[in-house]
Amino acid sequence: MKTLVILSSILGDRSNSKQLADHLLARLKQSEPGGTVKIRDLAADPVPYFDGATVGALFTPAEARNAQQQRIAALSDDLVAELFDADRIVFAVPVYNFNLPAQFKSYIDHIARAGVTFRYTAEGKPEGLVQGKQVLVLIARGGKSEGTPDDTMTPYLKQMLAFLGMTDVTFIAAEGMAMGELAAQEGLALARQRIDALSLDARQGLAAA
């Protein structure tokens, strides 16, 4: 299988969400020795935030773009191509102030492309085009808000990913990362256990074993 990993924490190797991604990748290395992994770190190599030039480039037909617009659109095209090429997509996302990092939101803006990753039917209903993917969202959160109104990021990501066609999505959160060393270690351990309990068979989708 081809696995695409999107990292988004600004903390690099000290990132708790990256630790979860590393744990998953170690498991995949054993269970899928013939698989391939592509890692994109949005903090180390950020995608540009949306501006007028970006919107103009993406909404200009490819054959009508000037040289600058071609360069701008090429990055978005590459990000989208990675999505379609992958069998499994892993998003490692920390929670910053109740929501996702700005660099991850910018990434979403680049991959949400009308006519490319989603379209509208004749009835005006949206149809996601990034289909048939296993998606795993690994979250690191300072407090403990899973399943409460304070968790505003998970509902947004569920809606956004479904809008793009990604419906086989599993969320695993390491909570309590800012509640002291003991709570953080317990939160990471529980999240690792949940990762270990996953069935990663592409034919079955992501499910607890």
Curated annotation (Swiss-Prot):
GO terms for molecular function: electron transfer activity; FMN binding; oxidoreductase activity, acting on NAD(P)H as acceptor; oxidoreductase activity, acting on NAD(P)H, quinone or similar compound as acceptor. Pfam families: Flavodoxin_2. It comes from the Bacteria. InterPro entries: Flavodoxin_fold, Flavoprotein-like_sf, FMN-dep_NADH:Q_OxRdtase_AzoR1, NADH:quinone_OxRdtase_FMN_depd. Its EC number is 1.6.5.-, 1.7.1.17. Its cofactor is FMN. Binds 1 FMN per subunit. Gene3D superfamilies: 3.40.50.360. Keywords: Flavoprotein, FMN, NAD, Oxidoreductase. The keyword Flavoprotein applies. It catalyses: 2 a quinone + NADH + H(+) = 2 a 1,4-benzosemiquinone + NAD(+); N,N-dimethyl-1,4-phenylenediamine + anthranilate + 2 NAD(+) = 2-(4-dimethylaminophenyl)diazenylbenzoate + 2 NADH + 2 H(+). FMN binds at S9, S15, N16, S17. The keyword Oxidoreductase applies. Homodimer. Belongs to the azoreductase type 1 family. Quinone reductase that provides resistance to thiol-specific stress caused by electrophilic quinones. This is FMN-dependent NADH:quinone oxidoreductase.
